[in-house]
Regions:
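Short histidine/acidic/glycine/proline-rich micro-motifs that form metal-
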Residues: 22, 51-52, 122-127
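Short internal beta-strands
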Residues: 45-48, 139
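Acidic, PIN/NYN-like endoribonuclease modules and their adjacent C-terminal/linker elements
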Residues: 2-4, 28, 124-165
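Noncatalytic, typically N-terminal accessory segments of nucleic acid-processing enzymes
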Residues: 1-7, 16-18, 77, 81, ...
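PIN-domain endoribonuclease scaffold, especially VapC-family toxins
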Residues: 48-101
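Short, well-structured N-terminal submotif of metal-dependent ribonuclease cores
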Residues: 1-46, 53-66
Length: 165
């Protein structure tokens, strides 16, 4: 049985960190072209709140995202039903005092609604005394598949071309 997903829901950190660090379009334009193609065929999507989080900053990533073909999933009634359950059971997922992780429950809710695999840079919190909870913790508890961006690249057999200029 294949573990390959039909759809992938991207967390904001997958795009932000890739743009700022290891897949900067100056030296890895292929990554962004592939994401655009995956968006066109409906293989990937981002929740509306992830989109808003990224375009809030007027930078090159936000400009790219606005012009990309990655579908932006809007908030719907079924998604809000999932949100209520997530926030009831995992109130520490969102840090309201610092306005952090505000899109995280929406990433999970949209993935649930679409039966999609979440792609995130977050890692499980395993410390027993931690007052934080991350997307992978909630996913594991709710039976939602999640992977990091390197697993995503491997799973879709994405290849990059390199050359000297």
């Amino acid at each position: 049985m294949s573990t390959k997903a039909n759809k992938y829901c991207l967390d904001a950190n997958v795009l932000i960190q890739a743009w700022q660090k290891y897949y900067n379009p100056k030296f890895c334009a292929d990554y962004w072209e592939i994401l655009t193609e995956l968006g066109k065929i409906g293989k990937i999507f981002i929740p509306e709140l992830v989109y808003e989080e990224i375009i809030r900053t007027d930078d090159d990533l936000s400009k790219w995202l606005k012009g990309s073909k990655i579908p932006i999933n809007k908030i719907s009634e079924p998604v809000t039903v999932h949100i209520r359950k997530i926030l009831e059971n995992y109130p520490l997922l969102v840090d309201n005092t610092k306005a952090r992780s505000l899109a995280d429950p929406w990433v999970i809710a949209h993935a649930l609604h679409e039966n999609a695999t979440i792609v995130t840079k977050e890692e499980k919190v395993t410390a027993l005394n931690s007052n934080k909870i991350k997307i992978p913790n909630v996913c594991d508890n709710m039976g939602i598949r999640w992977i990091n961006d390197f697993q995503f690249i491997d799973e879709l057999d994405i290849k990059f071309q390199c050359s000297l200029t």
